[in-house]
């Protein structure tokens, strides 16, 4: 009986979480003249793809916004990997390092900060560096929130790898600087893919709040900010808006579905043990 109740609760929770997504998909496919139909049918009789074409007509810069969002997400992922790989290797292998535990504690603590808590200091720093209204400002700001968990995941994964392989490479004449690119990185491919997708999705989801304070140039806006700026100036056309938002979710969803095996393996491999 207890198992049944747990399963029932899980099913109801999943349905509750999927309802907004279902409503978004249905609204994006529903003809505009039926959008105000009351009561709104759970399964509309008519569907159309014209809302997607209309979204591009209403928001001429939509392709540019999509490209900007991809650039921001990919940039955050790249910086996260550049920092997390060597940091994770150092923390995972050199356990005699004096400040290893404080650094690991700081990495855990850094995950507790929400982006909205740091918006003001981030803006002040970017302003002083002259990076406001640049791609790099949003990428750098987004990386602040992905590097800690990325480093933690890489450290955890590296601890599951046998150190004998690296020791054998050293004996064969491989320098310490070549071990990371030639030995460690190929063996940590699942963790690298997991970190890349995690950082991309996180960077994608945080673009709006970061770009809202760092970007005012219309050409540099990500999709979420561009849609907000456009639809806040005019009457909301829900069908076209939902179509545009649905398109914005496809890239991270497709990436997750393609690499989900590596993501799960990278996220669950190993644990931090001293």
Predicted regions, residues:
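A structural signal for multi-pass alpha-helical bundles of membrane permease subunits
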Residues: 3-274
